[in-house]
Amino acid sequence: MSWLIQNRIGNTLLRLNPSSSSIAIFSTFIKNLSTASEQLPETLDEYSQSEEIWNVIVGRDGDRDSEDDVFKRLSSDEICKRVNLSDGLVHKLLHRFRDDWRSALGILKWAESCKGHKHSSDAYDMAVDILGKAKKWDRMKEFVERMRGDKLVTLNTVAKIMRRFAGAGEWEEAVGIFDRLGEFGLEKNTESMNLLLDTLCKEKRVEQARVVLLQLKSHITPNAHTFNIFIHGWCKANRVEEALWTIQEMKGHGFRPCVISYTTIIRCYCQQFEFIKVYEMLSEMEANGSPPNSITYTTIMSSLNAQKEFEEALRVATRMKRSGCKPDSLFYNCLIHTLARAGRLEEAERVFRVEMPELGVSINTSTYNSMIAMYCHHDEEDKAIELLKEMESSNLCNPDVHTYQPLLRSCFKRGDVVEVGKLLKEMVTKHHLSLDESTYTFLIQRLCRANMCEWAYCLFEEMISQDITPRHRTCLLLLEEVKKKNMHESAERIEHIMKTVKLTAPVK
C-alpha cells in the first residue's frame, strides 16, 4: 500500500474516531491490502509515483480545462520534478486517465518535456485510442500523422483507429484508414483485410463489412478466417440465417467449416434458447466431419445452466462422453458446477476426486473454486475451508480472488464480520492477492448494510487508489450511508469522485 493511501486511510480513521472494538475488526480489513505490491519495490515505487501525479492533477484545486493546464500543473510541481519517468509509468498514467483526454494529452506533453524521455509506440497507440474514444477525430489524426513521420504506425495502431471510427458509426473513415496502409509502410493483404473486416463485424457493422469484402476480394484472396469473421459477425448481430449462408459460401470457396465455425452458430442458438436447433447442429457437425469438441459441449452446458436446466445440461455431458470427445478442465469445471446446482454433491466430489485424476485431466484453480463455491452454497463451509487448505498445500495451483468470494459471502450471511477480516488479511498477506472490482463492490455494499460505512468508505478510497472504477450504484449507496452518519468530508470526497471519474453506468 502506498504511503499516500496509508496516510489517507489513517487520517480518515482519526476523523471518524471509531470505537476500539471496531478498530480491531477493521485492522484486518485494510492493513496490508497491498502487501503483494510491497514484495516488489520497483512496482510499488512506480505505483506511488502514479498516485502522486494523479493527486497533482485531480486532487488539488485549480483549472484543468485543457491539456496545457495539466501540463503546467505537472511542470511546476516539485514532486513531479523528482519523478523517475519510465515507459511503464507513462502507460500507467495514460491508463488511469483513459476517460479524460485532456489530462492524458497533458501527461504526454509533460513526459515529452522531461529530459531523456522519448515516447514509445505504445504510448502513441494509447493516445490515439483515448482520443478516438472521446471522438476527438482531428486531434487523433494529428497524432497519427506524427506517428507516420516517425514510422511508428503498426497494425495495432491501425486496429485501434479503425475500431474507434467503426464504433462511432464512421465506417467510411475506417475503410479510409485501410486505403492508406501504404502511406504507413504497411501492406494491403489478407491479414490487414481481415483486421478491417473483424473490426467492422465486432462493432456490428457486418453489412458494411460485406460491402468491403465484395470490393476487395478481386485482388485480395479471402481465407477460412475471413469467413469465420463473418459467421461471428452475423451471429453477434443475431442474424443466424446469414451465418448459415456464410457456411455455404465458405464451402464454395473450397474451405471446410471447422469446429469454430459451427460452435459460433451454436452459441448464437443458445442465446436464442433454440436448443432443438443446437442439437440439430451437433448432428450436422458429426456428419460433416467436424465433430464437436469440449468447448462446443461446454458452451451448451453453460447456457442450459443459465436457464437452470441442470438435468438437461447433465444429459449433454453424457452425450459428450459417449461421443468419445476428450474432456478438458473447462468441461469438468462446468460439470462440477452443474452437479452442484442440481444438488448432486456426492457425484461432484467423485468427479473431482476420482474421474479427473483417472483421465489425467489437470485440476486447476477454477476446479477448486467450483468445489468451494458448491460447499458454501450448500452451507458446508467447513468442507470449503478444508478444501482451501488442501489447495494451499498442493503444488497444483494457488487460490485467486474468486476462491475467496463464496467464503466471504458465507461469512456475511452468518454475520461474522471478524472472519471476513481474517479472510481478507489471508488473501493479501499470505497469497498476495489484489481485490478486484466485484470484490470491492461486494464488501462495500455488505459493510454498508452492516452499519459499518466507515470501513466501507476506507475500502472505497483503496478501490479508487487501485485504478478500479466504482459502480454508480455503489457510490450512491455509500454516499447515502456516510451522510446518515454526518461524515461530511467523506460525502464531499465521494461526490468529487462521482464528478471527476467516469463511473460504470447504473443498471437500468
UniProtKB/Swiss-Prot annotation:
Residues 1-74 form a transit peptide. It is found in: Mitochondrion. Its main location: mitochondrion. The keyword Mitochondrion applies. PPR repeats lie at residues 120-150, 154-188, 189-219, 223-257, 258-292, 293-327, 328-363, 364-398, 400-434, 436-470. GO terms for cellular component: mitochondrion. Keywords: Mitochondrion, Repeat, Transit peptide. The keyword Transport does not apply. Disulfide bonds: none annotated. Pfam families: PPR_1 (PF12854), PPR_2 (PF13041), PPR_3 (PF13812). InterPro entries: Pentatricopeptide_rpt, TPR-like_helical_dom_sf. Belongs to the PPR family. P subfamily. PANTHER family: PENTATRICOPEPTIDE REPEAT-CONTAINING PROTEIN GUN1, CHLOROPLASTIC (PTHR47936:SF1), PPR_LONG DOMAIN-CONTAINING PROTEIN (PTHR47936). This is Pentatricopeptide repeat-containing protein At3g04130, mitochondrial. It comes from Arabidopsis thaliana (Mouse-ear cress).
